């Protein structure tokens, strides 16, 4: 009887230690995988897709008439104090903030959570293929105060600092949709 009890205890002890060892290994592997995936997403997929989609919209917007712009983004051309352009302004501005309570100065400042949210908005609301043509903006740094008297095309809106966006330490006029004449000529297709 004593032998049976001792053998049972030995078997239970062995299974307990083996079980814990397996759990521990599995847990650490999962943790490593999650970290690797997060790093990969942050440095590649979402950030590049967001940038590509934004620049695609920038190019399309700059080459279309006001009515064509409205047709491209009907959900965001709303009636309001400043007309359709104000609606599109809010739409594009959303790419950079993704949440009115979470302000960012650069696409690179986004966490994975907000990057994923932006990608969802791009695909869902704009129906934009995030892997198509990309516009490279001129690598020029300037402050919004230089353009306080400039007006948007097809609009009576007089821009203020609210309508300028800082991307990677550089200021772009008009939410990236409208660059001043000197800089816009440097946009590369």
Locate predicted features.
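Positively charged n-region of N-terminal signal peptides that target proteins for export
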Residues: 1-4
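Hydrophobic helical h-region of N-terminal Sec-dependent signal peptides
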Residues: 6-14
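C-terminal motif of bacterial Sec signal peptides marking the signal peptidase cleavage site
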Residues: 16-19
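Short, low-complexity N-terminal intrinsically disordered segments enriched in polar/charged residues
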Residues: 23-63
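Hydrophobic pocket/interface hotspot
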Residues: 57, 68-69
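Short solvent-exposed beta->alpha transition segments
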Residues: 70-132
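A short hydrophobic beta-strand element
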Residues: 128-146
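Short beta-strand edge/turn micro-motifs at domain boundaries
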Residues: 151, 155-189
